[in-house]
């Protein structure tokens, strides 16, 4: 095995291989099972940035639209700035998209199904933070 940084080592170990495989249906299922066994739930999550699922927010970040419109859409759509509770790892593997997790927004209690690669654990010192960060790094860089 070549010298890898610790994160690359952890990702390789998910698949039991020297080389990190590309994101595909089979590898998404492998990662899903890995996370299902290791994530501690409930877990408090938040979005990473205003792209993909949270892409509606991008224009507001650049100064377009009113604050009232932003707040209205935020209640309806969910924001990457919101906090979400993952009560259990109730997820679906969408081979074309991502691992989709069912979360409940705090405080409004609205439920969403959000791509896991768009979320991170709020507690950066937790094992969940590392697990989810490793998944996102793999998902973004091996697609």
Q: Residue locations for each model-derived region?
A:
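Basic/aromatic-rich interaction segments and small domains that mediate binding to polyanionic partners
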Residues: 1-54, 61-131, 142
């Amino acid at each position: 095995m070549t010298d890898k940084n610790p994160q690359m080592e952890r990702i390789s170990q998910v698949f039991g291989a020297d080389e990190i495989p590309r994101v595909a249906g089979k590898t998404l299922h492998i990662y899903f099972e890995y996370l299902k066994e290791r994530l501690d739930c409930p877990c408090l999550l938040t979005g990473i940035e205003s792209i993909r699922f949270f892409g509606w927010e991008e224009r507001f970040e650049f100064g377009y639209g009113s604050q009232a419109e932003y707040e209205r859409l935020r209640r309806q759509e969910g924001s990457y700035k919101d906090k979400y509770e993952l009560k259990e790892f109730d997820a679906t593997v969408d081979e074309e998209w991502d691992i989709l997790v069912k979360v409940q927004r705090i405080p409004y209690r609205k439920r969403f199904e959000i791509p896991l690669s768009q979320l991170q654990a709020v507690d950066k010192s937790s094992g969940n933070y590392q697990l989810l960060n490793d998944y996102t790094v793999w998902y973004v860089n091996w697609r």
